[in-house]
Amino acid sequence: MIPVRCFSCGKVISSVWEEYRERIKSEPPGKVMDDLGIERYCCRRMLLSHVEVVEMLRRYQ
C-alpha cells in the first residue's frame, strides 16, 4: 500500500504510483520521476524507498 501523501510535504503521490511502478521496469527511476513531475526530494524518497509490505505479510496468513 503506497501512502496517499508524502509524509514530509503532504503532496499527493498515490496518483503516480501505478505508472511509476510500470515504467521503472524499463527506465531509470530518476527519469521516470522527472517525467511524472515528482521534483521534491521528500516525494522522490517516498517512491524510491517504498516496500510492498502486503506481499510479504501474505506468506504468514
Swiss-Prot record:
Gene Ontology CC annotation, any one: DNA-directed RNA polymerase complex
- Provide the leader sequence positions: none
Catalysed reactions, semicolon-separated: RNA(n) + a ribonucleoside 5'-triphosphate = RNA(n+1) + diphosphate
Oligomeric state and interaction partners are given as: Part of the RNA polymerase complex.
Family to which this protein belongs? Belongs to the archaeal Rpo10/eukaryotic RPB10 RNA polymerase subunit family.
What this chain does, per the entry, is described as: DNA-dependent RNA polymerase (RNAP) catalyzes the transcription of DNA into RNA using the four ribonucleoside triphosphates as substrates.
The protein in question is named: DNA-directed RNA polymerase subunit Rpo10
Q: Which organism is it from?
A: Methanothrix thermoacetophila (strain DSM 6194 / JCM 14653 / NBRC 101360 / PT) (Methanosaeta thermophila)
